[in-house]
From Swiss-Prot:
Molecular function GO labels: ATP-dependent peptidase activity; ATPase binding; serine-type endopeptidase activity
Annotated GO biological process: protein quality control for misfolded or incompletely synthesized proteins
Upper lineage: Bacteria, Pseudomonadati, Pseudomonadota, Alphaproteobacteria, Maricaulales
Catalytic activity, EC: 3.4.21.92
Family designation: Belongs to the peptidase S14 family.
Name listed for the protein in its UniProt record: ATP-dependent Clp protease proteolytic subunit
Pfam family, one: CLP_protease
GO cellular component: cytoplasm; endopeptidase Clp complex
Organism the protein comes from: Maricaulis maris (strain MCS10)
Active-site residues, record numbering mapped to chain: S106, H131
InterPro entries: ClpP, ClpP/crotonase-like_dom_sf, ClpP/TepA, ClpP_His_AS, ClpP_Ser_AS
Entry superkingdom: Bacteria
Presence of the UniProt keyword Cytoplasm in the record: yes
Length: 211
């Protein structure tokens, strides 16, 4: 049985460009990286996080004042991996805009709302899901207690991050994240997870990308 990620990588389009030195080919994601566009697609895990972090650091080194665009379509994943990306977004000097296409769930929703203020977007048919962290553990009773206490610490920290980026109170966030909470793009806007629902790119942005 084939790994879906391997199948996807084999289907990634190649872009060929003419340069003064002849033809150069890029996979589509590398070509878009040249335009300061990053994709978070699929489950968020350690390997993906290291690639996203490296791209963010590279683009900051190229131009610390220029915007980085991050497109998100993710069901979420490992909390520590997601927080690594989050911390890097806050650490670098480049402003990071975020855009949800498809789904931003769990850690995906946290990264969506972590974008630069007034630069957090969702497509009209995007779905956003927030919830509290979960985990399973086996072992001695004392180990289980420590693990449960650690999950509570993580829960509090994630709640604080949502409070910071949405402007909601801690109690509102805790209530919203108590169970899987699915929102439409408009509901995500009203909750404060994004700043705007956009259907079409602005004309001046189109012109800028063509120049």
């Amino acid at each position: 049985m084939h790994d879906p990620q391997d199948v996807m990588m084999n289907l990634v389009p190649i872009v060929v460009e003419q340069t003064s030195r002849g033809e150069r080919s890029f996979d589509i994601y590398s070509r878009l990286l040249k335009e300061r566009i990053i994709f978070i697609t699929g489950p968020i895990e350690d390997h993906m996080a290291s690639l996203i972090i490296a791209q963010l650091l590279f683009l900051e080194s190229e131009n610390p004042k220029k915007e980085i665009s991050m497109y998100i379509n993710s069901p979420g994943g490992v909390v520590s991996a997601g927080l690594g990306i989050y911390d890097t977004m806050q650490y670098i000097r480049s402003p990071v805009s975020t855009m949800c296409l498809g789904m931003a769930a769990s850690m995906g929703s946290l990264l969506l709302t972590a974008g630069e203020k007034d630069m957090r977007f969702a497509a009209p048919n995007a779905r956003i899901m927030v919830h509290q962290p979960s985990g399973g553990f086996r072992g001695q009773a004392s180990d289980i207690e420590r693990h449960a206490a650690d999950i509570q610490k993580i829960k509090r920290r994630l709640n604080e991050i949502y409070v910071h980026h949405t402007g909601r109170t801690y109690d509102e966030i805790e209530s919203a994240l108590d169970r899987d909470n699915f929102m439409s793009a408009q509901e995500g806007l009203e909750f404060g997870l994004v700043d705007k629902v956009i259907e079409r790119r602005a004309e001046d942005e189109k012109e800028g990308s063509d120049s």
